[in-house]
Amino acid sequence: MSVSGLKAELKFLASIFDKNHERFRIVSWKLDELHCQFLVPPPAPPGSPHSPPPPLTLHCNITESYPSSSPIWFVDSDDPNLTSVLERLEDTKNNNSNGTTEEVTSEEEEEEEMAEDIEDLDHYEMKEEEPISGKKSEDEGIEKENLAILEKIRKTQRQDHLNGAVSGSVQASDRLMKELRDIYRSQSYKTGIYSVELINDSLYDWHVKLQKVDPDSPLHSDLQILKEKEGIEYILLNFSFKDNFPFDPPFVRVVLPVLSGGYVLGGGALCMELLTKQGWSSAYSIESVIMQINATLVKGKARVQFGANKNQYNLARAQQSYNSIVQIHEKNGWYTPPKEDG
């Protein structure tokens, strides 16, 4: 679909579901994203005093292949009822995506007519809308080598789909692609605070290297010594994502070096409420998680254990340690340090 055709469709939808609609409102939109609200009907009978429940915030990502592939919806909530609604939307989208080539062609032929028909809707103000010339391409600000990685992932996904060997979910894959693009644009990534590498080109399995920590910390000094001894000057993390990401957190563990302190558990798991279902939010970005882990290691006075058995860090042991600590904290709660402690 052309940019003008997509813009025409979105503008038309925004004119129908405006900010005064009684049930569903498009708060703002861009060519690749919608920010919407669903106003939940109050549970009390009409006429009785009540406070209306807060609206549900929904996000819609429009992929490059639209309309051949359906938009991806996600919500900033861990409510299982909302998750089931999204699953039903996925089923509906799959059924509706089997249209014929003639229908797609017909839609393309109607784009220009629609654009002309709704020119009079230009007076509607959308806070996030910008002139086309000023809009950032989703690839803007990304280095060529990283664009090549993104393109390789897209090609692999298409080939897997054709071969019937699709892994993961559409929802998780689209969100992870967005996270990866955001990381590639990030100044923290570009300045070498951390790096990201996909393991075996899998979108669901990442190696993250923490390459810069607080220079005044003992951990920084340890990493300098480690560089001299072993040629390693980073902390290697493994991020594993499930099909229901972003509604479940990634599983994160330290791969190397062996650390003491810093809330690092046996096997390399991390004792952080942020990485549990209880403390996780689907609104969190992966970069914010990476930066929080970096800060937590320093705050927890992590130190490199020189000469330690490197085989003690593995996935099975990390998962065991993680599950044990989560059970303990579910019973006893999590300790929140004073604000002055960061």
From Swiss-Prot:
Keyword check for DNA damage: no
Domain of life the protein comes from: Eukaryota
Enzyme Commission number, as recorded: 2.3.2.23
Transmembrane segments: none
Keyword Chloroplast: no
Region (Disordered): 88-116
Catalytic activity, as annotated: S-ubiquitinyl-[E1 ubiquitin-activating enzyme]-L-cysteine + [E2 ubiquitin-conjugating enzyme]-L-cysteine = [E1 ubiquitin-activating enzyme]-L-cysteine + S-ubiquitinyl-[E2 ubiquitin-conjugating enzyme]-L-cysteine
Keywords for the protein's UniProt record, in alphabetical order: ATP-binding, Cytoplasm, Nucleotide-binding, Transferase, Ubl conjugation, Ubl conjugation pathway
Enzyme class: transferase
Residue ranges constituting the UBC core domain according to the UniProt record: 171-335
Family to which the UniProt record says this protein belongs: Belongs to the ubiquitin-conjugating enzyme family.
CDD domains: UBCc_UBE2Q
InterPro entries assigned to the protein according to its UniProt record, in alphabetical order: RWD_dom (IPR006575), Ub_conjugating_enzyme (IPR050113), UBQ-conjugat_E2_core (IPR000608), UBQ-conjugating_enzyme/RWD (IPR016135)
Protein name in the entry: Ubiquitin-conjugating enzyme E2 Q2
Organism whose genome encodes this protein: Bos taurus
